[in-house]
């Protein structure tokens, strides 16, 4: 039996909605209403929030943004299949310079073979290496210390403890990976 014959029989057995049915027209009308604004004009573009309002509490932040990257952030980007450089650019709408401290590199090397891809990404030439003068310090302590000294950095991490420590420092934005996207945590409205 040919395909045309079976489709005719299907239409006879099952009730098929006609294309001119009112139920389908109501859905189309709802879609058209969503496209228009209150004034009846078409929405052609959505205004973008000015970046200077977002970073109003920290005047040393500005493009190109220097982003200190933690070990967790690289691993989560790999798990979520996000390109680190493109993700940062699309998130911040500006040129970004990802920075990795020597402590983070040492932490990646200690993790061993399982995290060799993350180590290979961290050794990329596009990353700016931040030399550490201290010896044998925990990577989170190194990041917090560097951010407290120079408030020109954004911090990219998924570590809950590090996020809590950085939230106590006013004016430092935190980037994290969630739902296959890199997101910026909202800055505190009032700085003490």
UniProtKB/Swiss-Prot annotation:
Gene3D superfamilies for this protein: 5'-nuclease
Alphabetical list of Pfam families matching this protein: Fcf1
GO annotation, cellular component aspect: nucleolus; nucleus; small-subunit processome
Domain of life of the native organism: Eukaryota
Name assigned to this protein: rRNA-processing protein fcf1
Record organism: Schizosaccharomyces pombe (strain 972 / ATCC 24843) (Fission yeast)
Protein keywords: Nucleus, Ribosome biogenesis, rRNA processing
Positions of disulphide bridges: none
Any one GO BP annotation for this protein: endonucleolytic cleavage in ITS1 to separate SSU-rRNA from 5.8S rRNA and LSU-rRNA from tricistronic rRNA transcript (SSU-rRNA, 5.8S rRNA, LSU-rRNA)
Main location: nucleus
GO molecular function: RNA endonuclease activity
Subcellular locations according to the entry: Nucleus, Nucleolus
Function noted in UniProt: Essential protein involved in pre-rRNA processing and 40S ribosomal subunit assembly. Required for the early cleavage steps of 35S rRNA at the A(0), A(1), and A(2) sites.
């Amino acid at each position: 039996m040919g395909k045309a014959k079976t489709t005719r029989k299907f239409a006879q057995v099952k009730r098929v909605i006609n294309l001119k049915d009112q139920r389908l027209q109501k859905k189309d009308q709802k879609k058209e209403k969503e496209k228009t604004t209150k004034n009846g004009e078409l929405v052609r573009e959505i205004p973008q929030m000015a970046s200077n309002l977002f970073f109003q509490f920290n005047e040393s932040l500005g493009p190109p943004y220097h982003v200190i990257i933690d070990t967790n952030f690289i691993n989560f980007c790999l798990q979520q299949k996000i390109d680190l450089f493109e993700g940062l650019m699309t998130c911040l709408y500006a040129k970004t310079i990802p920075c990795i401290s020597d402590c983070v590199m040492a932490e990646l090397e200690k993790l061993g073979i399982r995290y060799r891809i993350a180590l290979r990404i961290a050794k990329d030439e596009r990353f700016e290496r931040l030399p550490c003068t201290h010896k044998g310090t925990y990577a989170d302590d190194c990041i917090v210390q560097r951010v407290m000294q120079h408030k020109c950095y954004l911090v990219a991490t998924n570590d809950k403890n590090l996020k809590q420590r950085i939230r106590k420092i006013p004016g430092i934005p935190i980037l994290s990976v969630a739902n296959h996207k890199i997101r910026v945590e909202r800055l505190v409205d009032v700085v003490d």
